[in-house]
Structure formats: C-alpha cells, structure tokens
Curated annotation (Swiss-Prot):
GO terms for molecular function: L-seryl-tRNA(Sec) selenium transferase activity. Keywords: Cytoplasm, Protein biosynthesis, Pyridoxal phosphate, Selenium, Transferase. It comes from the Bacteria. The lineage of its organism: Bacteria, Pseudomonadati, Campylobacterota, Epsilonproteobacteria, Campylobacterales. It is an enzyme of class 2 (transferase). This is L-seryl-tRNA(Sec) selenium transferase. The keyword Transferase applies. SUPFAM superfamilies: PLP-dependent transferases. It comes from Wolinella succinogenes (strain ATCC 29543 / DSM 1740 / CCUG 13145 / JCM 31913 / LMG 7466 / NCTC 11488 / FDC 602W) (Vibrio succinogenes). Its cofactor is pyridoxal 5'-phosphate. GO terms for cellular component: cytoplasm.
Amino acid sequence: MSHPLRSLPKIDKILQESRFADHSKELLTTLARDYLEEIRAQFLQDATPIPPSESILQEVERRYEASLAPSLVPLVNATGIIVHTNLGRSVFAPELIEEIKPLLTSYNNLEYDLKAGRRGERYSHLHGILKAILGCEEVLVVNNNAAAVFLILHTFAQNQEAIISRGELIEIGGSFRIPEVMKNAGAILKEVGTTNKTHRRDYEEAITPQSALLMKVHKSNYDIVGFTQEVDLQELIELSQKHNLIDYYDLGSGFLESVPFTNEPTLKKIASLSPSLVSFSGDKLLGGAQAGIIFGKKSLIDRLKKNQLLRMLRVDKFTLAALEATLRAHLLHDYEKIPTLKMAHLSLEELEERAKKLKSRVHGYESQILQTQGYAGGGALPNQSFFSIALALCHPQKSPMELEQSLRARGVIARIEQERVLLDMRTIFTSQLESLAQILNEVF
C-alpha cells in the first residue's frame, strides 16, 4: 500500500497547472512548498488526513492571491481618537495629495540648486516656511522625533552628562524608553528630583564640569497630578544660559494653532522663548507626514547637520513634499487641507448632524445618539479629553464583541462602552457615511 504522503502533488506539477499560467513562478513555488511542508508536518504529528489534490491547489491559489493583496488597507476610524497611532496617525486631505502628486510622479529638485545649477541641500525646502511660522533661527527635519532625540543627544551629550527630571524618564509605545535612548546615544544620564517633584535647585546642584545638556521631556502619554512640581521651559532656558549649557525640549507632539481642548502652549509660544533646541513630531497635532522637526539656535543645528548619523536619519521627497504642503496650509490658515485640525474643531452640532444621517441609513439595530468623550491620541495631550458625539449600536443577536469583530473584519474600527458598540462621529469623514451605512446593514 502506497504511503499517504506520496499522494501529495509535486511542485513542478503545481506550476504546470493552467490556472497558474500567469502567476509568478517564484512566489508560487515558495507558497506551494510551504503549504506542502505544513501538510507533511501535520500528518507526521497526528496523522491528519492528506487533503485531495484539488483542495491543495485551491489553497495554494488562495494563499497566492492573499500574498499579493496590499497589507496596508484604508479603514474607517470610528474610535474618536484623532491621531490614532495604530491607524496611521494624521490623515492627508485629498486636495493635499493632488497638490504634491506632480512631485512624486516626476523628477524634482530634491537636492538640486536650480539657481546655481549644482547640488543643493534637501533640508532647504522647509527652511523658509518653518522659520516664518515659528520665528526661530534655524530648523532641521529628520525621519521621526525619536531620531531627533537620538541625533541631539549623540551630537551634544556623547560621553557627557544630560540632566533630566526623574519624572520625565518616560516610556512610550513600542518600548521606546528615554533612558535607553540616552544610553545608546552615548549620553550619561543624570536624573534629578523625584517622580512627582523636581525643583530648579535640583538641576542646578547636579551641574558639573561634565554636564552638557539640560533636557526636558513632554509627558506625552501620562500625567502626574496632585502634589507635583516641575521646572518649566523658561526656567530651564535661564539655567542653561547661566551655566553655558544647552537646553533641549523633547516636545513629542506640539501644535502650531490653538487646539480647542487644551491649554498647552503652542509651538509659536515655545519658539518665542528662544530655546536652544526643541524637537517634535510632524504627524501628530501638526497634521503632516511622519518626521522629527528640530528648531532652535543656528549654531547648534549647524553642528547637527555635520553629524554623520544625519545621512541615516534623513527624510525622503514624499515627507518633504507632504510636510511643506501641510505647513503652507498652516501658514494660509487653510485648515480644510489639515484633517487633524479640522476634526479637532468640529462642533457638537456638526457631529450630531453626521450621527443623524448615519442613523437614518441603518436598519435593524437598537441605536442611540449620545454625547461621549474622545482624545487627541498619538501620545499628545494626556488626560485631556473633549466632548464628541457617537452613534451607539446594539445588535439583537450579536454581542457587542461579536459586532465589533464583524465591523473590524470589514475595515471599521469602533470601540465598546457599556455593552454597546460606539461609532464616534469626530473621526468618521462625511465621505465615509454612505459606505459605513452599507457595511452596517450587511453585518446585520
């Protein structure tokens, strides 16, 4: 009697199947080999029956199609979290994409000086507009704020002391820890104060001839309340000037215009204090592309540009184009091109109107329009919530978790509160309401 494993089709026979005539032979070979190996392993482990040849061919074809499908897909963000890190943070307006499309579909002057006819500098493209908006001496853009932190520490505090409050030794998403970053950058961490209280004298008493930098980190994803004390940026700047040190503020998020649900200072206000160096993210409340934007003293940023690490951390043409377009929209107060800010400023009346439109198009659910709370997200504005409007849904047969899973499978990311699935209107675009209603009716 023939061994069951002998019934498995050979790789070359699979490749010769007419259904695979237009398929990539390299990819098909890899997928078929992997699947056949799985079948062998399962059979040898617990004698799992060998599937018929046709079933094997169908599964190989399914895997082939799945492997070619984009892994990044558009979603409906119904969570109410505006800058949702897991969902790609800030969204670009279609008008902005159209604006930068010619730069991405043709050659451009990324590193070419059109006036001089020779090699230029890619960082010059954001130089003028950022200086105009912030009123600072100089700017530099790297590929994210973590890169900015590392570059600054590596340039100015390698084998020297970077003094920081114990209450600001944060960890953010992905296990990004400030102490580890400082260590990897070659800086000597010198923590001062306590978790809840740090005074100016704590910094001053810690300063030695080996000190290079006074660092302040924005507590982006948590807050300390109650019996607390911290040294503000103005004091840190004064102290650094007194002792001829560099003050550096890792702002994390940062925003140019006033956001309705926070009393934190804007980037313009921070820049007006003339700090040595500040860094923040381009894709959080600024509403642009992922980038780490550094501004401050020209002499210091010139030194950053000479660090060989900058070559590894530099931004590409898409980032520069998207950031420039976003900053231009800020400069012209054209917030239609900055969805992040537009969402933040939506009134409850506008949100309720969206909820009513969606509710009228959905059938069979027990639904209710209610006021809820949302957050900025992206590690910005910790513990600062704002009012929003949501459509709360209950399904007659499915549990809230089952309904949430069904929606998620169709690209709708919602949240569950009090045994109901909530669709927060603040982060759902009006252009998505029709398709969202269709999905909800299909799920029902």
